[in-house]
Amino acid sequence: MQKKWLLNKTNKDFLDYMSRETNVSSITAQVLINRDIKTPDAAFAFFDSGINSLSDPFELAGIEKAVLRIQKAIRNREKILIHGDYDCDGITATVIMYEIIKNLGGGDIVEYFIPSRFDTGYGFHQSAVTIAHQKGITLIITVDCGITAYDAVNRARELNIDIIITDHHEPNRDENNNLYTPKLPDAYCIINPKINLNGSNNSPLSGAGVALMLGLALNSGNLEKIEDLIEIAMLGTIADVVPLTFDNRIIVKEGLKRISKSQRPGIIELIEISSLNSPNFKTDMFSFTIIPRINAAGRMGDANSVVKLLTTNSHDEAKRLAIWLNDLNIERQKIESEVLESAISQLKTISIGKAIIIADEDWHEGVLGIVASKMVDRYDMPAFVLNIKDGIAKGSARSIPNFDILKCLKHCSNHLIQYGGHKQAAGLKLEAIHIKAFTDCVNEYIVNISKESDLITTLNIDYNVTLKEINHELMSEFSRLEPFGYSNPEPLLGAKGLVPSNLRVVGRNHLKMRLAHNGSVIDTIGFDLGESISWINSVKSIDAVFTPTINEWNGNRTVQLNIKDLRPSNGKN
């Protein structure tokens, strides 16, 4: 699908002012402005933000009440359960909360529980409450889940178990009352940045981030008490693709600094088995190495063992668990490849509407989210990938950048048993006999209710440059904007009238070539752009959208362009 190129522009006088006052190039100044950083003070705060810039945790509603209840439980030696989730964010949030309570003197009274994807599925359920009651637990703290767990919370109240919900997912809203009034479980207290009566969302923390803030509050704001947990919160924050702004950016920035020096056996062994040996860790390194391994446990087996891996003080145990996790991830990759191939084959036999909605009885439930993501990347449209078992279809939905998948599911909720998630990623369950009706509903929603622009991938270009302007000095300026991620993407640049040469396809359909302009020449790589080679060979010059990166090879550091899109040159903006 063709992408729309949109060039961001700013008044030249203001751009020159920001460039001069912050002592950066006009290119970097424009990137700052595009990230809504529009004063020199805001720019310097962005450049220099560190652990001491974290928000006051007591700004989060419900946190003071939670602190008092947890302190009381530790004082009175009540049994406490940390109830997490089986993805990386939920696992790391569990680790944080478990270790915080242990370090506060609750080591003999606290335990944790991660539900199975294949038994109870996502979330906080009545079955967990029943087991907790049988163990004599009187306080349950949920992390990364619970905001819609009405039945489980009601059952806990009947059994005199207090529930503290810490979550970051969207609550249900009472449409009959007010769009912004959340419909909440009757818990002892709830900590969730998404609960705000004016509908704003000033603190888009991950589940691990919320747990870290509660841990900070339990330690009266003493940052030293949570320093060794920042690397754990970083993994959850990167994994859940929350906006890398404000506290999230600080957590990731500080975590990247600290994780290479980690004293935690589980982290040391995960870095070793993932072959991570760079002196300068970047967010995407973890997205493709450690995080998939952590997620593999929840996708393929028992995620409780990952909590053990990340909390053990034994290097031998950590090594054993890291090897187990790595083997599990290899198995996950094999199954994922098989399901992806099957899904692509199925698409060739059906008529595709405005979204991909496919199901099969043989597809492993644990890899459906990854396959859905790859469907989105390949076909540039929302994707719903489902497994059918005993008449129930259950699976994952993934979306393109501008399309809110959660709103779509809400519109079609009368066909669903259950759904939940975020704008870009969600889970759903429905009776298999309703898949056709659900498919029709999704297509109807896209055609009649969503905006046409929602389905067009837009490349927001920060600045049009010449190749001469792309140098190590510019890359040094860009490094001050890191860490990059959702809502703080790598600078996206454009250039026109480029002459291609040395074209070749490498790896799995990746395009390698050199681009030249006015005497400047630069190497490029375009992932999944190998098919473009035929039309590029038929034109004299091209326009390109790209992110500049540093390529390190044999001790040399050169600037390389990561191509995002190409078109024949036409001289227009």
Where are the language model's segments positioned?
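Histidine-centered active-site/metal-ligand motif
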Residues: 168-169, 364, 422, 510
